[in-house]
Amino acid sequence: MSKKLISIVDVKDYVGQEVTIGAWVTNKSGKGKIAFVQLRDGSAFFQGVAFKPNFIEKYGEESGLEKFDVIKRLNQETSVYVTGIVKEDERSKFGYELDITDLEIIGESHEYPITPKEHGTDFLMDNRHLWLRSRKQMAVMQIRNAIIYATYEFFDQNGFIKFDSPILSENAAEDSTELFETDYFGKPAFLSQSGQLYLEAGAMALGRVFDFGPVFRAEKSKTRRHLTEFWMMDAEYSFLSHEESLDLQEAYVKALIQGVLDRAPQALDILERDVEALKRYITEPFKRVSYDDAITLLQEHEADEDTDYEHLEHGDDFGSPHETWISNYFGVPTFVVNYPASFKAFYMKPVPGNPERVLCADLLAPEGYGEIIGGSMREDNYDALVAKMDELGMDKSEYDFYLDLRKYGSVPHGGFGIGIERMVTFVAGTKHIREAIPFPRMLHRIRP
């Protein structure tokens, strides 16, 4: 095969021309003198049509019948070079069709495990390396790619510098009970939960920084929203106020949604996502409500017929049902701000005049997707941070570099983090986070 290849996504530019595409066969149908071949090449899906009389006319009866028979006997996931004339076809769900003039098999495929019938989740996860080839899984990966692309674009446009934090660390950024421990030349080390502590050092040097990479949480959770390994975007910035931080977070999430609408509209169509809802999340302002007001709202509505959550008192943390109700009540992504210090991280700065609450926010996505962003202002006063660590019984020697940041020109600063998989799940409208990452790592799954 010496002809120049084109991608399926570009066929609209070649109407009336003969092209060659490298692709995999996803399905075939037809009978008698006609064969339909469903194709994919990673960029999009497409249909080719082969007519027996055309093959006989072009190649002669013996060769034409032989070539046509090869097409009729194609198996699912056989890889091929297929040549044909691109034609517009309003009847086709693709808008275009390929009038096949030649086909060459590259790699055979026999007894492909994932047939068009329904399969159980465990079977599909055991064959994740193959399940990724399906239309919906490819669509989710395209949305993931669009979100990652939009992340880099947004932070570049807003003056942030990419700042890489280490994967191995000797201390915890969050809950120390959720750490994966490993041996580091005879000393204990831990897989990173977050790059935040190191990003704060970056913010003191470069002003605005962000990190994007894998993080690890040893949570023994089986919910549809948790992974033990996932990709986190963390951002840190100096000299911004709490309200300015919320403005930045809102702009970022809206940029991600817009990025998917711009770069992966066909993926949203495949997943049958409510695009009008996504557009509304861009145009309407996000809601902001204090933790205490949210608790009061929950208490006022807990007797409603359509509620399904446990009673909470002021000082209690939300569960998933509470987060779902809050975001659905407002109908748009909702910031819950100023949580109790009692169950938030040691580094969060107290609300001025109210040390029981901290300057933080969780962004809750509507439609039942829950928290997608967590952020806060950081305690920038050395003495106050030391006092908090002493109160919690923390070993300050493990955080000497972090405390140094408060000793040499400390400034007001804050940051936030977003689990990319949660954002992908929300924008794609999928039911489980395991589909938002190529190879999910969960409580009872570490392969393939």
From Swiss-Prot:
Any GO CC annotation of this UniProt entry: cytoplasm
Enzyme class, spelled out: ligase
Key words, A-Z: Aminoacyl-tRNA synthetase, ATP-binding, Cytoplasm, Ligase, Nucleotide-binding, Protein biosynthesis
CDD domains per UniProt: AsnRS_cyto_like_N, AsxRS_core
UniProt superkingdom: Bacteria
GO terms of molecular function: asparagine-tRNA ligase activity; ATP binding; catalytic activity, acting on a protein; nucleic acid binding; transferase activity
Catalysis performed (reactions): tRNA(Asn) + L-asparagine + ATP = L-asparaginyl-tRNA(Asn) + AMP + diphosphate + H(+)
Family: Belongs to the class-II aminoacyl-tRNA synthetase family.
UniProt subunit comment: Homodimer.
The protein's name in its UniProt record: Asparagine--tRNA ligase
Source organism per UniProt: Streptococcus pyogenes serotype M12 (strain MGAS2096)
